[in-house]
Each structure stands twice: as C-alpha cells, then as structure tokens.
UniProtKB/Swiss-Prot annotation:
Span of the annotated motif CX6CC: 466-474
Alphabetical keyword list: Cell membrane, Cleavage on pair of basic residues, Disulfide bond, ERV, Glycoprotein, Membrane, Signal, Transmembrane, Transmembrane helix, Transposable element, Viral envelope protein, Virion
Protein name in the entry: Endogenous retrovirus group FC1 Env polyprotein
Cytoplasmic face of the membrane: 540-584
Known glycosylation sites: N69, N247, N272, N276, N308, N313, N322, N334, N342, N346, N478
Gene: ERVFC1
Known tissue expression: Low expression in skin, testis and trachea.
Domain observations: The CKS-17 immunosuppressive domain is present in many retroviral envelope proteins. As a synthetic peptide, it inhibits immune function in vitro and in vivo.
Site (Cleavage): R383, A384
Membrane-crossing segments per the record: 519-539
UniProt-listed Gene3D superfamilies: 1.10.287.210
Length: 584
C-alpha cells in the first residue's frame, strides 16, 4: 500500500521559524498613502466592481503626481474604441457641473472637458494628458494633485467608449487611504502562519475534542487547547526520547493529514482505580479513534469486556460499574473513547470490546533515504514501442523484423487458445462437482422429509413408508467418488498450467511447440534466400544474352562504317525506266 504524503517536522520548523530579519524589519512597519482605482459596470442584470490598479505615494508623502498602470478597462474592449473619462470636479462650465451629473458624470455636452486617451509616445505626455496608452497592453492614468483633500473622500468619474458617445458605459472611483505597509518577508510568513492556522482549525473541528479533555497532555491538571500539529510532533519526539531510541539526529518524524492524528494503543493491564483521580467530564470523549494492532501478537493483552474470549489474553473479572481512567488513560469501546466505564452484567455494552488504552501521536519515523524516496519518487523509464527504430537499425530491417515477429504472435495466440481450452475444462469440472454436491444435498433433503413423514405417521406396520405413500423410495447415493474424480482433474489441470512446457507432446501439433518460437523467425529469410537462388540463374542468363547482343551490334557497326555500296546494272535499268515515264 502506498504511504501517504507526509507532513514532516523539518517542513513545519522551516515554515514556522522566520528568517533573521534586518534591523529595518524589526522596527514598526511604516504607514503610507495608497490610491485605489475601482471600475463599476453593468454586466447583464448584475452590477460588477473590480480594482483596476493601486499606486503608493512617496514615503515622505503625496507631494508629486502619481500614475496608475493597468492593462485594460472591463467595460471597454481594447481595439475599436478610444476610452474617455469625465470628472465633475474639473469642469469649468456650469452646465457641465450642474446638469445630468448622475447620468453623464460631467459631460452632458460636447464642450465639456473630457480626458481622451492619447498615444503614449513620450513620458512627458503624462504631465500634459491625464489618460494615455502605449497602444498595446497598458493604460496610464495620472493624478496631478494627489495632495488635494478631495481624493481622501473619493472622486467619481464616468467612462465613455468614444468621445462622441452620448452615454457612459462604466463608472470609475478614485480614493486615497492611509495603510500600514508590511515587509515582504513578514507578509510571506504571515500568509504561511494563516494557512497553518486555518488547517489546524479544520482538523480541530474534525477531531471533535472536548474543550476540557486531557487529550495529548500527560498532566491531568492541564487543559488541552486547540489541536496543533506542532504539539503533536513534540509529544511524539518526547515519546521517542522516553523509549530510549538513540542516534536519531538524521531521522524525521512525519504525520499524514489524511489519517487521524492519534491512535489508541492497548495497555497490558487494567487501570489502577484505587487512587483518587481528578474528575473528568462524563459521556463520550471522542469517536472513530483507530486501534493499534500489533502484527506479532494476535491477541490483545488485556480486555475489560469482549464478545469473543479468544480475542484477549486476559479478561477483567471484577465489577465494571463506576470505573474511571487515570490521567493519560482511556477506555476504548468500539472506536469510542471515554473516561468512565459503567457497564452492568445485563447491559448490551458487556458484549462489546472494551480495552484500556493510551493515546499516542500517529507518527512515522523515517530515515534520510526513506524520506528522500517519498518526496522525490524515482522516475520510471519508458520502454521503446519499436526498438529497432530507436536503436538506429534501418527501416527495412525494422519492417522485416516486424514481419518475422508474426510467427511469435501466432504461437502466442495458439498458446492462448490452449490455455483457454484448459480453463474451460477446469470450469466444467468445477461446475460438475458443484452440481454433484447439489444433487447430494437434494437427496439428503428428500430422505429426511420422507423419514420425518414416516415417523410421524408410524406406518411401518403397513408395509413401510414407500408403500404407504405410494411413491418411489428415495435413497442417498454417495457421489463423493465423482467429486474426488473432478478434484483430481482440477489438480492435473493446475499442475499442467504451472509446469513449464518442455515436453514435445502437444495436443495441438508440432507448431505449438516452444521450439516453434525460435524456428519461425528464421523461416522467412530462408524462403527469401531460396527464392533468390531459384531465379538467379535465369536473371544471370538473360543479362548475359543482352550484353552479348549489344556487343555484337556495336562491333559490326564499327567494322562496316568505311565501306559504301557499288552501283550495278539493275540500277541503270531502273534509271532508264524512270526517264521514259517522265517523258510520257
């Protein structure tokens, strides 16, 4: 079974031990003025608000202009638009300040003052224009007078998609607050501490501990506070020291978040109830607490009650009324912990398993190597799907190899069919045995029924049960021999499946022999070589004839080239006939 992912003592100490800060970090964190830019727009029937950007004034105060940097407006899509902002406070005309302020936000007319987005070609433009853009990804909104008191109460403006639009598409709000700036190191530690605290609160809720219960402390006067993994690991380290384990400087105590933090360990003897113990709250202390089982001891050393005497080595023989557990001890009864045990002899709880236990932190001790293997598991190497191509053999060789592997696949299919037949025989033998047993049970049931009826009617003096009932007599037929035969068949098949296939006697033929796996891959190249040897003489003879013919024609042409044909008498006769025909 795979081990759970551990939460180690080393990691906890690393998270909770802060880095030694410098002198500047030990002083009280400074306070600064911070500007916020919020955008509000309507999305369907829902009103949405988001923080576009924040910017801090200089440490000595807001004595110089500040600029917001943000990527985009939520209500204006980048591209086919030119965002424009209107404020009421910087309007010079009374019509722009007094009319349709809630609707238009200072720009009900075209002559009102509007801050149109300008292309940010130089940094000096920020001193001239309030709203600029680099044309790609960033907008710049400048506050020229951050020292003005209006920003503390907040300034509201309207956002238009185009300067010529009649109505705005969103609302902007800019305000200034005095905040406490936390250094980055302390901020990171604070976030980690908050996360650990949240996890401990969740686990504390799951543990369902009593606020006054002595859960993980050994002093019965101490009150257990909220559950803490640090406290759990500390108690685990204390137990390790008490156990006398040495040379643990390079070991790790680990616990798992997915498992209960405590485990109940059975004690070898009953509690000493003679002394006066501190009063504990009555009732159930905790539920679903797992019990530790020693794999080397099949029995529990001591039990107060048990449903089976074989489970315990020793059972409590005294009275189980009004028993109290001392500090650090509990009664474990069916996954439930309690400090008091009050069981009468006729109570149903007397048939449950109740043990004296002590709660121990559920920790695991790992060495350096074991922890390294858990945190960084070894990488599994992937096997090559087509090894000939991976190791650099040519594609032709790979194709030939894949073709030769067909024989091995055929042999594997034949072996699988043989195995399927044997399994089928085993299933049939098992079914036959079960059917035989069922027939025996049916036969016994019929005989018992007939005997019961015969004995009830006492009809032995009238010819026996069969004659009185007027039906055939049924007797038990011992079919155990058939069962034994079927079992022997199963044993033979089992031995045949486990025995290596080394004998040459196969029911399917010689092609199912293991030797076939080695022979078949060589058949294809042998056949190819034989085919080449068969056609090689014909090919060679054809090539030889062609070469001879070409050589003969070439030699004749070279020898007859200087000679020409001489005229004969037949040639003169042909010329005379030609002239006569032309004269006619």
């Amino acid at each position: 079974m795979a081990r759970p992912s551990p939460l180690c003592l080393l990691l906890l100490l690393t998270l909770l031990t802060p880095i030694v800060p410098s002198n500047s970090l030990l002083t009280e964190p400074p306070f600064r003025w911070r500007f916020y830019l919020h955008e509000t727009w309507t999305q369907g029937n829902r009103l949405s608000t988001v923080t576009l950007a924040t910017v801090d004034c200089q440490p000595h105060g807001c004595q110089a202009q500040v600029t917001f940097n943000f990527t985009s407006f939520k209500s204006v899509l980048r591209g086919w638009s030119n965002p424009t902002i209107c404020f009421v406070y910087d309007q010079t005309h009374s019509n722009c300040r007094d009319y349709w302020v809630d609707t238009n936000g200072g720009c009900p007319y075209a002559y009102c003052r509007m801050h149109v987005t300008q292309l940010h070609t130089a940094k000096k433009l920020q001193h001239t224009y309030r709203l600029t853009s680099d044309g790609r990804t960033t907008y710049f909104l400048t506050i020229p007078d951050p020292w003005d008191s209006r920003w503390v109460s907040g300034v509201t403006g309207r956002l238009y998609r185009w300067p010529t639009d009649s109505y705005p598409v969103g609302k902007l709000r800019i305000f200034l607050t005095y905040i406490r700036v936390i250094p980055q190191v302390l901020s990171n530690l604070k976030d980690q501490a908050d996360n650990i605290k949240h996890q401990e609160e969740v686990i504390n809720t799951l543990v369902q501990s009593h606020p006054k219960a002595d859960m993980v402390t050994y002093d019965d006067k101490a009150e257990a506070g909220p559950f803490s993994w640090i406290t759990l690991v500390r108690h685990g380290a204390r137990l390790v020291n008490m156990a006398g384990l040495v040379n643990l400087s390079h070991c790790f105590l680990c616990t798992a978040l997915s498992q209960p933090p405590l485990v109940a360990v059975p004690l070898p003897q009953a509690f000493n109830t003679s002394g006066n113990h501190t009063a504990h709250p009555s009732g159930v202390f905790s539920e679903q607490v797992p019990l530790f089982r020693d794999p080397l001891q099949p029995q529990f050393p001591f039990c107060y009650t048990t449903p089976n005497s074989s489970w315990c080595n020793q059972t409590y023989s005294g009275s189980l009324s009004n028993l109290s557990a001392p500090a650090g001890g509990y009664f474990w009864c069916n996954f439930t912990l309690t400090k008091h045990l009050n069981i009468s002899s006729n109570n149903t709880l007397s048939r449950n398993l109740c043990l004296p236990i002590s709660l121990v932190p559920r920790l695991t001790l790992y060495s350096e190597a074991e922890l390294s293997s858990l945190v960084n598991p070894p990488m599994r190497q992937k096997r090559a799907v087509f090894p000939p191509l991976v190791i650099g053999v040519s594609l032709t060789s790979s194709l030939v190899a894949s073709g030769l592997g067909t024989g091995a696949i055929v042999h594997f299919i034949s072996s699988s069919q043989d195995l399927s037949i044997k399994l089928q025989m085993a299933i049939e033998a098992s079914a036959e045995s079960l059917a035989s047993l069922q027939r025996q049970i049916t036969s016994v049931a019929k005989v018992a029924m007939q005997n019961r009826r015969a004995l009830d009617l006492l009809t032995a003096d009238k010819g026996g049960t069969c004659m009185f009932l007027g039906e055939e007599c049924c007797y038990y037929i011992n079919e155990s021999g058939l069962v034994e035969t079927s079992l022997l068949t199963l044993d033979k098949i089992r031995d045949g499946l486990h025995r290596p296939s080394s004998t040459p006697n196969y029911g399917g033929g010689w092609w199912q022999s293991p030797l076939t796996t080695w022979i078949i891959p060589f058949i294809s190249p042998i056949l190819i070589i034989c085919l080449l040897l068969l056609i090689a003489p014909c090919v060679l003879k054809f090539i030889k004839n062609r070469i001879s013919e070409v050589s003969r024609v070439t030699v004749n042409q070279m020898l007859l080239h200087p000679y020409s044909r001489l005229p004969t008498s037949e040639d003169h006769y042909d010329d005379a006939l030609t002239q006569q025909e032309a004269a006619r």
